[in-house]
A protein has these predicted regions:
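Membrane-embedded multi-pass helical conduit in multi-pass membrane proteins
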Residues: 245-316
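A conserved acidic beta->alpha catalytic loop
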Residues: 22, 37-46, 65-66, 88-94
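Catalytic donor/gating beta->alpha subdomain of glycosyltransferases that bind UDP-sugars
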Residues: 174-235
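Cell-envelope/extracellular polymer assembly enzymes that use nucleotide-activated donors
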Residues: 2-4, 32, 182
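Short aromatic/hydrophobic "clamp" motif used to bind/position activated sugar donors
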Residues: 84
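Conserved donor NDP-sugar-binding/catalytic core segment of glycosyltransferases
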Residues: 95-128, 200-201, 205
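Glycine-rich, basic loop-to-helix element that forms the pyrophosphate-binding segment
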Residues: 44, 63-79, 100, 150, ...
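Short, acidic, metal-binding catalytic loop of nucleotide-sugar glycosyltransferases
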Residues: 21-30
Length: 332
């Protein structure tokens, strides 16, 4: 069995070096690496060549900037593997990943699979805090690969794979936000098997800039409404929770201002719960302290994006703006 590792890249030379270093260190090397440079102004071709000379099977392609979905499709068209495996360029892969993946597929031959993401010990405390909030049940409901989840598992392209047979029938990714959720939905609709392999995590470097993190989760919230327009039955209660949290927080703040500070108690208890849970999970006071603002940004960004998109696309009836989505995704 040959795996084709497909990675879209945009101006991430240092991250690509770390990714290729981790792939070179794999215990099992039954894979090729297909790097697709999506119009970067700082290309990583020299890094790819360096690791190819070390013996890693790396194929490097440069194309005009059109967005990561088109870049992934470009890679799949040129890949030779039986399975396509997708990582983000800011991921680092544990040494036993492919050895474990082979075993998992032998025991449970899924058509499409995904794995969780985690924080490496070398990551900054901010990255670890964001990783915690992006994977915690308290802030996500477990929908990003947690063992306890409020909805069916949906693979994400930071750690996702599917067979060539899936690709032949379903086709490639659409150029849209949350394209991995859209892809997983189409795969499921075609009757293919989808599941979570908890044994194959990746180490995912999170954004260390709070503004960029806000923008990222804000777009996640907006894209959930786009998915609802495409798949009317896909919106679940768990997806609405950040928006409910934003509305509830604003209401409690107003009540605290005009009536009594006691209305802040529910907010305080929730943030304390996040701090305590993060402290137990990470064993670090610093990470636990940073997890509190990370959770506020995550829920606030997602919730406001969700509310904004719901109002404009559903209440005002404007629907999807495909051209805007494509333009926003270029160079991301």
């Amino acid at each position: 069995m040959l795996f084709s590792v497909i990675v879209p890249v945009y101006n991430r030379v240092d991250e690509v070096r770390d990714l290729l270093e981790s792939l070179e260190a794999q215990q099992v090397r039954k894979f090729e690496v297909v790097l697709v440079e999506d119009g970067s102004t700082v290309p990583c071709g020299d890094v790819a060549k360096e690791y190819a000379e070390k013996g890693l099977d790396v194929k490097y392609f440069y194309k005009d900037n059109e967005g990561r979905s088109i870049a992934r499709n470009y890679g799949m068209e040129r890949a030779k593997g039986d399975y396509f495996v997708f990582f983000d360029s800011d991921c680092v892969i544990p040494p036993a990943y492919f050895a474990t993946l082979e075993r998992c597929l032998a025991e449970r031959p899924l058509d499409c699979f995904g794995g969780p993401d985690a924080a490496h010990s070398s990551f900054t405390t901010t990255q670890k805090a964001i990783n915690y909030t992006m994977t915690s049940f308290l802030t996500t409901g477990g929908i990003r690969g947690g063992k306890v989840s409020l909805e069916k598992f949906t693979p994400r392209t930071f750690n996702m794979g599917f067979s060539r047979g899936v690709y032949d029938r379903v086709g490639g990714f659409r150029e849209m936000f949350s394209e991995d959720i859209d892809m997983s939905t189409r795969i499921r609709q075609q009757g293919f098997s989808i599941g979570l392999f908890t044994e194959v995590p990746v180490w995912h470097k999170r954004r260390v800039d709070w503004r960029k993190f806000w923008r990222q989760v804000h777009v996640f919230g907006m894209s959930r409404i786009t998915l609802k327009l495409l798949y009317p039955g896909s919106l679940k209660a768990v997806h609405c929770l950040p928006a409910v949290a934003v509305i509830g927080a604003v209401a409690l703040l107003l009540c605290a201002i005009f009536w009594s500070p006691k209305f802040l108690l529910p907010l305080a208890l929730y943030l304390i719960a996040i701090f305590i849970a993060a402290l137990f999970a990470t064993r670090s006071l610093v990470i636990a302290a940073k997890a509190v603002p990370a959770a506020i940004i995550q829920l606030g960004g997602y919730g406001t994006g969700f509310i904004k998109a719901y109002f404009t696309k559903i209440i005002l009836g404007r629907g999807r703006d495909v051209a805007q989505e494509v333009e926003m995704r270029r160079g991301k």
